[in-house]
Regions:
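Structural signal for short hydrophobic segments within the conserved structured cores
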Residues: 3, 54, 85-88
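Thiol-based oxidoreductase modules, predominantly thioredoxin-like and allied folds used
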Residues: 5, 26, 49-63
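The canonical Cys-X-X-Cys-His
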Residues: 31-34, 76
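Structural micro-motif
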Residues: 68-77
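Non-catalytic, surface beta->alpha helical segment in thiol-disulfide oxidoreductase systems
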Residues: 78-106
Length: 106
């Protein structure tokens, strides 16, 4: 099952208050890099059921993406209790994502 990118983005204060491990994925449904990354992200997340995965549709002027300094898609931001621990831009392998997930879910 593919989760769609949410057009309505959460506020930064809400994200900062999220408990536990969270993966914020910034992208767009029409982005080729984003589509190619989906199987890699799904594979990496399969071993991390406790990680909250939030997909946010990003565009210029979107405040949440700018607050995380997102410039290219997909950008994956890994959070533990609302604090950024890692960021991946256009990940090239599931292993790369798994290493970042291990930092927040362990």
């Amino acid at each position: 099952m593919t989760v769609e990118y949410a057009e309505a983005e959460p506020k930064r204060e809400e994200v900062d208050a999220l408990p536990g491990p969270t993966l914020l994925e910034f992208g767009s449904p029409w982005c080729g890099h984003c589509r190619r990354a989906q199987p890699l992200i799904a594979e990496a997340l399969s071993a991390h059921a406790s990680v909250r995965h939030i997909k946010v549709a990003d565009a210029s002027g979107k405040r949440l993406g700018r607050s995380f300094k997102v410039k290219l898609w997909p950008t994956l931001v890994f959070l533990r209790d609302g604090k950024e621990t890692a960021k991946l831009v256009r990940p090239g392998s599931a292993d790369e994502i798994k290493r970042a997930l291990a930092q927040i879910d362990g």
